[in-house]
């Protein structure tokens, strides 16, 4: 008796263990003996798994006697192949609805069990014999699409159990909790799942009852559309808006093959289905943009296309209790609450594309059953991978296997979510990012259009009554003969008195240009954007203003202009030869080069920079010439150098002129002629920018004599008329600000806490630069083609090329110093001439930066003027003074903004809140103290060693930092 007794040793976890072993072997590429190739990419696999999961592979591998054959799948995409591999090895895969039809078609061609017909006798799909499936013998062959409620809506910790369903595996819509945990452990480091969120992981051969709940909630394409209750019974369209609850209808049990082929064509014949189908279809199209899903069954896709209801399984428990276990009497699905909850849960964004629907319908045969559209042992539900719940947390799982043929840019926007990496992630996510930035660009343009002109008008309206000399001298920070800088609650105010006689006509002209700027500054189009009629009209108006009052000023071109980015300001320099010279109106091709950072084609519809070489009066008549030849109208010493890589980090943009010349600086922002090439990329300035047009007649007289301190008398007739200052544009700001400080004798501006405002340009650097140029007329302009830089530079001795590195932002952070009351200015040339580059954090994101958001190198306390716009607009007939508001970029101006800042420096007039701070300022910084801390990497000198450390950190981040006296780096 005892000898005949036998014990049955049952390995309860045999299947899951075996599956995890194969999965691990695949991850480590251990014992792989065949290779599958698609689209030039390779996936290694095991013959035994392929043979077990596909009769096609089994037959193919039996005929191969190679040790390691390579199968090249011609019509299968790599993402589809990868999804099928995951499906075969793990029994389930997550796939987007857009890719579902293509995947099923490929799986059908490869005869993957559970994903294709694979009909054997009686329409029963063969069971997977190998470890490629979770529920080997228990479940029958149709694939299931499981859907789980994303517990992240309620609690983040519930994600682990979101896909887990307790209970027996028979009749359950999802694997048991124990088996799911095993699979999760085995796949924690799975490269396929972690790198590809669109891997189809529907528990394949273990599928059971496909129940189509009528939850036609199109918002959540989590269509576990239970085809319960044959469509004749109403197809249970449980749209979220209608929230109609389908009654429990007896679903006739059909063959599982038919469950695998259930389409909404089942719903078509039934008269009762038509009404609910129409409702579902309406909701489908209405909420199409918001459809988020973890995965979608092909049948569900077809169902939704032909009016079938999209079901939202809010919970696995809902699926089990309400629909799955019931068999023929399955419930119609989750209640509307769970449906709506699922609708908004974070999942793969899937668009209900009719094309995809049609494709899926055409790729699969439809079984039309009047009242019986449910299958016996297989339930088609979509189950999100628990790994994604664990890993993605609050972020959406992004479908990275978007069928590019079916996807448009808008759809890519909709499907964009958290990228899980993988093969398709780079293209899809990059495209979405690109479009998103385009949208943000447009929104910013609209916001700017609403904000800037209104702000300018408000400022003008409020300040028009004020007279020229009514400056707030109580808060005066700096005062010279011609420029007074005061401070208000918003920032610093620059009051500029007229230098020289300027006619009211020119004032009107500048106002017209200002209006144009105010509009152009906030009008943004994309790289291929079309110009707006507003700009064209303003250009025409500006042209009329140019031509009417002054015959020497030619009309602006009326061709449309494109503004690639609202962040990019520029300075256009227009030189006008005095009275006897007439400059012809320019053809659109004739556009002057302008100063501007890289990648923006800057063709400004202004007169080009005409150079006069050793001659005080030279009449230049410019006919219509093509753009490429416009440099020939400049001096021969202008060498056009096309550079891509920088060889010199210094950009010199000091503009000097001989006597008798008038240079009008008219700011046009990002002007590009209509016939120019499209913009290659956008630039986001990572630092502050000028927002409003500063249009009024600010004139600065310049001579080319290398005198240490230039005065603002009209010694040589050279005049500058500045319409807009761009401090983010290194070339423009260098030229304009240097002239501002040089010729108006502005004492350097310094904040109360000893920090500097980047505005001052010392005369020494300008004269030194002029000496290097031999006293010639020297204009450095840079015209940017999409991928190259053209540096036009005139130099007497050598061809000195100054580049702006493409991909870097040249920004001025001028560490100004406060001198004695004599008004002498000491500053180093390098600080002003060398524009230290700052890497762009995000090269193609464009965003409007406000002073509150912008911390301008907080450690260095170096401020860049963000906004200059006229506060006081003087009378048109009295263009003798102008007031500019200089808003600074850092919010740490608090001490200066505080009304209690009552301690004033006797040397520079700065106010300090604390007397100790004023004392430190006077002892260390002010009172004629000379800079004594030279920078080891440039010619900059600082008054304090701490400022030198700030300078090195800011402008030489790649160089070794200074060692502090305390033994730590500053």
From Swiss-Prot:
Residue ranges with Low complexity bias: 162-175, 228-251, 263-293, 329-340, 819-828
Superkingdom, natural source: Eukaryota
InterPro entries per UniProt: BTB/POZ_dom, Dros_DevTransReg, SKP1/BTB/POZ_sf, Znf_C2H2_sf, Znf_C2H2_type
Subcellular locations according to the entry: Nucleus
Expression sites (tissue/organ): By stage 11, isoform F is expressed throughout the mesoderm whereas isoform T, and at low levels isoform I, is expressed throughout the ectoderm. Isoform K is expressed in both mesoderm and ectoderm. Expression becomes restricted during later stages; starting from stage 14 to 15, isoform F is expressed in the gut. Isoform I is expressed in the CNS. Isoform I and isoform F show expression in the epithelium starting at stage 14, though for isoform I the CNS expression remains predominant.
Keyword Zinc-finger: yes
Assigned GO CC terms: cytoplasm; nucleoplasm; nucleus
Compositional bias ranges of the Polar residues kind: 447-456, 808-818
Entries under SMART domains matching the protein: BTB, ZnF_C2H2
Protein's recorded name: Longitudinals lacking protein, isoforms F/I/K/T
Taxonomic source organism: Drosophila melanogaster
Lineage: Eukaryota, Metazoa, Ecdysozoa, Arthropoda, Hexapoda
């Amino acid at each position: 008796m005892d000898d005949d007794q036998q014990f049955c040793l049952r390995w309860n976890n045999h299947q899951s263990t075996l599956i995890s072993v194969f999965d691990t072997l695949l991850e480590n590429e251990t014992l792989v003996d065949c290779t599958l190739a698609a689209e030039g990419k390779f996936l290694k696999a095991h013959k035994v798994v392929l043979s077990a999961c596909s009769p096609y592979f089994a037959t193919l591998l039996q005929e191969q006697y190679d040790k390691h054959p390579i199968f090249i799948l011609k019509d299968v995409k790599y993402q589809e192949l990868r999804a099928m591999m995951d499906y075969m090895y793990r029994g389930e895969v997550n796939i987007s609805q857009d890719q579902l039809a293509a995947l099923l078609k490929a799986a059908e061609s490869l005869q993957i069990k559970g994903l294709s017909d694979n009909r054997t006798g009686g329409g029963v799909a063969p069971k997977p014999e190998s470890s490629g499936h979770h529920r080997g013998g228990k479940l029958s062959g149709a694939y299931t699409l499981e859907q789980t409620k994303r517990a992240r809506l309620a609690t983040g910790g519930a994600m682990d159990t979101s896909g887990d369903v307790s209970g027996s595996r028979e009749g359950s819509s999802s694997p048991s909790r124990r088996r799911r945990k095993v699979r999760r452990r085995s796949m924690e480091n799975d490269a396929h799942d972690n790198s590809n969120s669109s891997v189809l992981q529907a528990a394949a051969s273990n599928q059971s009852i496909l129940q189509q709940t009528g939850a036609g909630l199109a918002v959540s394409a989590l269509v576990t559309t239970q085809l319960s209750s044959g469509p004749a019974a109403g197809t249970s369209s449980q749209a979220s808006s209608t929230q109609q609850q389908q009654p429990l209808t007896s679903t006739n049990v059909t063959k599982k093959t038919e469950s695998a082929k259930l389409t909404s064509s089942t719903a078509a014949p039934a008269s009762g289905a038509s009404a609910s189908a129409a409702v579902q279809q309406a909701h489908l199209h209405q909420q199409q943009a918001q459809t988020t899903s973890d995965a979608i069954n092909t049948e569900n896709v077809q169902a939704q296309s032909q009016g079938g209801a999209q079901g939202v399984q809010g919970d696995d428990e809902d699926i089990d209790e309400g629909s799955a276990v019931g068999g023929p009497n399955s419930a119609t699905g989750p209640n509307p609450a769970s449906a709506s909850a699922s609708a908004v849960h974070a999942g793969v964004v899937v668009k209900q594309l009719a094309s995809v629907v049609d494709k899926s319908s055409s790729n699969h045969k439809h079984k039309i059953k009047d009242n019986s559209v449910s299958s016996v042992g297989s339930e088609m539900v979509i189950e999100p991978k628990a790994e994604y719940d664990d890993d993605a947390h609050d972020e959406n799982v992004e479908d990275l296997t978007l069928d590019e043929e079916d996807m448009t840019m808008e759809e890519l926007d909709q499907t964009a979510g958290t990228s899980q990496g993988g093969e398709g992630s780079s293209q899809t996510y990059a495209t979405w990012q690109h479009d998103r930035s385009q949208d943000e660009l447009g929104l910013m343009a609209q916001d700017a259009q609403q904000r800037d002109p209104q702000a300018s008008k408000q400022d003008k309206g409020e300040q028009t009554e004020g007279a020229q000399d009514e400056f707030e001298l109580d808060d005066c920070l700096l005062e010279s003969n011609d420029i007074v800088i005061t401070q208000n609650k918003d920032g610093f105010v620059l009051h500029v008195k007229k230098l020289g006689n300027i006619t009211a006509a020119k004032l009107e002209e500048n106002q017209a240009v200002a209006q144009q700027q105010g509009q152009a500054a906030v009008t943004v189009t994309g790289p291929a954007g079309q110009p707006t009629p507003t700009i064209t009209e303003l250009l025409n108006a500006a042209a009329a203003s140019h031509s009417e009052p002054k015959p020497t000023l030619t009309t602006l071109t009326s061709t449309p202009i494109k503004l690639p980015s609202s962040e990019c300001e520029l300075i256009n320099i227009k030189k006008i030869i005095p009275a006897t010279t007439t400059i012809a109106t320019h053809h659109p091709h004739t556009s002057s080069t302008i100063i501007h950072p890289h990648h923006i084609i800057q063709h400004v519809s202004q007169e080009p920079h005409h150079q006069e070489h050793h001659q005080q009066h030279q009449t230049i008549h410019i006919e219509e010439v093509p753009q490429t030849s416009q440099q020939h109208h400049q001096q021969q010493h202008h060498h056009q150098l096309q550079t891509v890589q920088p060889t010199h980090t210094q950009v010199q943009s000091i503009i000097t002129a001989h006597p008798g010349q008038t240079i009008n600086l008219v700011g046009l922002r990002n002007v590009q002629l209509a016939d120019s090439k499209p913009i290659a990329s956008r630039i986001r300035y990572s630092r502050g920018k000028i927002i409003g047009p500063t249009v009024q007649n600010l004139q600065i007289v310049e001579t080319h004599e290398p005198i240490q301190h230039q005065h603002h008398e009209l010694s040589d007739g050279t005049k500058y008329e500045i319409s807009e200052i761009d401090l983010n544009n290194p070339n423009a700001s260098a030229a304009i600000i240097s002239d501002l400080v040089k010729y108006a004798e502005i004492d350097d501006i310094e904040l109360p806490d000893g920090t500097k405002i980047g505005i001052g340009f010392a005369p020494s650097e300008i004269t030194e630069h002029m000496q290097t140029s031999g006293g010639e007329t020297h204009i450095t302009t840079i015209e940017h083609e999409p991928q190259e830089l053209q540096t036009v530079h005139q130099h007497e001795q050598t061809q000195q090329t100054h580049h702006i590195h493409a991909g870097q932002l040249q920004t001025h952070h001028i560490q100004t110093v406060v001198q004695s009351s004599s008004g002498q200015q000491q500053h180093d040339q390098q600080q002003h001439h060398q524009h230290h580059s700052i890497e762009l954090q995000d090269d193609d994101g464009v965003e409007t930066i406000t002073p509150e958001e912008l911390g301008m190198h907080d450690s260095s306390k170096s401020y860049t003027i963000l906004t200059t716009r006229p506060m006081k607009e003087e009378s048109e007939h009295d263009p003798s003074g102008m007031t500019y508001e200089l808003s600074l970029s850092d919010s740490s101006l608090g001490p200066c903004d505080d009304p209690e800042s009552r301690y004033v420096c006797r040397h520079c007039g700065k106010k300090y809140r604390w007397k100790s701070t004023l004392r430190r300022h006077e002892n260390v910084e002010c009172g004629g103290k000379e800079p004594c801390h030279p920078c080891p990497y440039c010619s900059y000198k600082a008054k304090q060693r701490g400022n030198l450390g700030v300078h090195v950190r800011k402008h030489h981040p790649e160089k070794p930092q200074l060692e502090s006296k305390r033994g730590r780096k500053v």
